[in-house]
Amino acid sequence: MTQLQVKLHEKQREVFDDPRRFRIVAAGRRFGKSRLAAWLLLIEALQSTSKDVFYVAPTFQQAKDIMWGVLKDLGKDVISSAHENTSVLTLVNGRKIYLKGADRPDTLRGVGLHFLVIDEYADIKPNVWEQILRPALADVQGKALFIGTPKGRNHFYELYKYAEKGTDEDWKEFHYSSYDNPLIPESEIEAAKTSMSSFAFRQEFLASFQAASRDIFKEDWIEYGDEDEEPKDGRYYIAVDLAGFVAVDKEA
């Protein structure tokens, strides 16, 4: 059988080599999540003896836009057929890689899976995993990879924190910023930083779960006083945005 020459940078390799059944990767933009997922989809499909694999994005069109070209490029030596309309790849061992959209949940039902990638899980309803995809892994103890950039403290965050606790040996979390991709010039990331709010930058490039999309102010717009300097006589005002606090956010 043709041997695939897997090429990954150091941080991608950490995830690729980890043996845990369920891996969660929260990473900044352009880290290389899609390429990592593509290699794992190909390898897992080639190793499967009975079941196929899924790549699931928030929509079918996103799945095709993100993954179709990458898979065909990396897997050209092991792909026997490619069906453009349905976005299904058949490999030389007969196993198939299906590209799916979570917005069409009925197309995800009725199959058993050897391996599964869920991309941008923060943008996918949690019941798609809990009620449809998780049961599909049960009969052959299939594996899953979750990848995405955080979108506040939602179900992606909760699943990440569950893995982070370390109480379930089947789960492992990984956190990377865009700086962890050695193929992206640091100067390019710094250039993007100058035109973004500090909160947006933290979310998109540093993969911060705390950077909610409603936060629009850049940190360097705020001038802090000397904490050791006593205030002068006069009238002072304070404004508090309670929506910015985690406890209030959870109760809202």
PLM region spans:
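Pre-P-loop entry segment of helicase/translocase ATPase cores
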Residues: 1-22
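Conserved P-loop
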Residues: 20-88, 157
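A short beta-strand-to-loop transition that corresponds to the Sensor-1 phosphate-sensing loop
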Residues: 29, 59, 101-103, 147-152, ...
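Inter-Walker segment of RecA-like/P-loop motor cores
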Residues: 60-114, 202, 209
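Residues immediately C-terminal
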Residues: 62, 123-124, 245
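Walker B catalytic acidic pair
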Residues: 119-121, 242
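ASCE P-loop NTPase helicase motor core
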Residues: 123-196
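ATPase catalytic-site recognition across NTP-hydrolyzing enzymes
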Residues: 181-247
